Amino acid sequence: MESYAVSRRTLLQWIGKTAGAAAMYQAMTSLGFAAETRHDEQFALSGAPKGASVLVLGAGLAGMTAAYELRRAGYKVKVLEYNAKAGGRCWSLRGGDRYTELGGATQECRFDEGNYLNPGPWRIPYHHHAVLAYCKRFGVKLEPFIQVNYNALVHSTEAFGGKPKRHREVQADFQGHVAELLGKAVNQGALDQSLTVEDREKLFESLRAWGALDHDGNYQKNMESSLRRGFAVDAGGGLMPLAEPSEPIDRHALLDSGLWKKLIDGQEYEYQSSIFQPVGGMDMIAKAFERETGEMIRYGSKVTRIDQNEQGVTVTYKNSDGSGEAMQDKADWCVCTLPLSILSQIPVNVSQSMQDAIRAVPYDSSVKIGLQFKRRFWEEDEHIYGGISYTNTPIEKISYPSTDYGKPGKAVLLGAYVWGPNAYEFTAMSPEQRVKKAVEYGALLHEQYPEEFDNGIAVGWHRVPWAQGCYGMWSEGSSEKHYRNLCQIDGRIVLAGEHASYIPAWMEGAIQSSLDAIKRLHTHAVATQRAA
């Protein structure tokens, strides 16, 4: 048999790619190797030039952050916002809300009181320090968001007759089978030239612990594996039956199914516990910012042109409903937080390099569908409390509510979170068709769907009038060429938003981008005044 040297680093990288971060960390710990966004909670600008004014375009989180901090510094601030309320993509839909998308389709949300859908952001990772800091400052109550639920489902129409498996079964069996194979490689001496005897023993023990292997290094039906994957019969009390171990999924069938690909989601940095959500809906954050900045905001204002010269900035706008004449506001400086998908359609007097950057970033497509059911059958029938189920069908995910467990009556779950080509296909449908498809696909995981379904609402982000896309989707090439040009101050204008951050699509990116932009703009404004 051919032998070859494998370094510790290569071995760990291979384990990580094959078995995931948890396995790699377990191995790193055994071999003695294993031993985040920045935000200044004391951030404050001061000493604004006397009488200096700033126009902020857009009252999403980036815009309201800029308005809040600039006013604290002493600037005169006015915000122009397209919608009748603030928040932008930080948005929740509740019963009674009406929403009209591009193309004219209007939906009225018919959810019961207390139920809601977050069409945009829905999670706050523990390391998104800026978002959490403003939540604390403004008194936004938070609660846990359940990302990983080991009793949730993993499903493929091409595996196991289309029947879903439990997350815990797939994870336990995948870890067990991989650990068994790696353990055999260790014991057969394949790594002897690269690992000491002590390393080999420690690595084998770590694989036994990680994969729930028996003393001989095998993964099989027994009490140890069932403590990971669940029992065929759970333990009881008194004269009830003893616990019975369950049968692991066949290794070849599991590998062929591809279900293991979904295990990585909860291990990615952005989705690791703890994760939070505002009590009552994500727009509680927007409403908190709005309480601090609302008097500066002119609602229902559609920006149509942005001009600048050496003296200041002039923004032309009209009422969003089309009524009235065009209006203009002037200021010394401008912080523009409009999505690039919108800004690229507006005449803007900036350098060619910034214009090129504005037009270089396409916006990803996404669709979210909220479904209200007559009862919480996922809890009552299947004991799924929060978390996410995954499927290879176009709906991709079903996310169960992380709050009000056991509450009687109707409840809403996220019935689809669609990306890529499927999102374009769903966006082309009518809202009613999107909801119908979500119910059809969801029924492949939960047979209760058709009988328990009550009503739904669907948001396709490329049809959202004020965004026309989900988020700025930088490529490596476009980022290298255009990112710095997009973020630099251009005369008297600076851009901010998730698209001007290294954390696109996240609220944290929007806020961090805004703080960086206004800090630089303030420094520039002060220097300009001194030089005058």
Please tell me what each predicted stretch does.
Residues 40-183:
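N-terminal glycine-rich phosphate/pyrophosphate-binding loop and immediately adjacent elements
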Residues 149, 153-201, 372-385, 406-450:
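Mid-to-C-terminal "cap/lid" subdomains and adjacent gly/pro-rich loops that border
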Residues 1-7, 33:
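N-terminal secretory signal peptides
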Residues 45-48, 108-116, 260-274, 291, ...:
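Short glycine/proline-rich turn/loop motifs
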